[in-house]
Amino acid sequence: MDQDDPAEALTELREKRLGLLEIVQAAAGSGLAVYTIWALLLQPGFRRVPLRLQVPYVGASARQVENVLSLLRGRPGKMVDLGSGDGRIVLAAHQCGLRPAMGYELNPWLVGLARLHAWRAGCSASVCYHRKDLWKVSLRDCHNVSVFLAPSVLQLLEDKLQAELPVGARVVSGRFPLPTWQPVAVVGEGTDRVWAYDVHGSGPTVSSCGVPIKAIPESSSTLVPRAPV
């Protein structure tokens, strides 16, 4: 399978056998879908987000979280997760030394769940979860960014990242690669695969004519030294 093909990645997600955790997450997702319909009809703040910029929630697996951390661990500077869902990536980032760590999520149920997880882990005073539209978050002081977003919004996200991130920042994208940026590191296989991108003085390296970059040809991972800050 072409690891960078969003259609094939989505097919693999559908074909994976569901365990108990996945079933619980699916049930939660159904509830969130009902909430989304309600929010679209009744909640003005949610209605103001264009439909093409709304991203469905799919929780990251433990392997996906670890793959993200493997590309960020040891780096200085603020870490943010855009569309942080139930907060698992932010909490894990804080626990492995990425500080400050914070998440931005528009869905109030998920923000509440993230804060509950942080409280249960004894980290409620150390990690921050904000209920805020990720498109309105300023990234000018962020040096480490993680995203697990749908392919339909990644092109627009590239524009925001390039306009706002400081030199030396690193972006890690899970499940799907950024469409025109060239990764400096790739870890994992299949739906657990994540891509790292570094921002340089002239901006990130992009492919010619906007053609998506193919994954770095390694069986499991390819790593490079972290970007200077």
UniProtKB/Swiss-Prot annotation:
Top-level EC class as recorded in UniProt: transferase
Region of interest (Methyltransferase (MTase)), ranges: 43-77
Gene3D superfamilies reported for this sequence: Vaccinia Virus protein VP39
Region (N-terminal sequence (NTS)): 1-22
Presence of the UniProt keyword Transport in the record: no
EC number(s) given by UniProt: 2.1.1.-
Region Pre-methyltransferase (preMT), residue ranges: 43-77
Membrane topology, from the record: Single-pass membrane protein
PANTHER family for this protein: ADENINE NUCLEOTIDE TRANSLOCASE LYSINE N-METHYLTRANSFERASE, METHYLTRANSFERASE DOMAIN-CONTAINING PROTEIN
Function of the protein: Mitochondrial protein-lysine N-methyltransferase that trimethylates adenine nucleotide translocases ANT2/SLC25A5 and ANT3/SLC25A6, thereby regulating mitochondrial respiration. Probably also trimethylates ANT1/SLC25A4.
Protein name per UniProt: Adenine nucleotide translocase lysine N-methyltransferase
Organism from which the protein derives: Mus musculus (Mouse)
Underlying gene: Antkmt
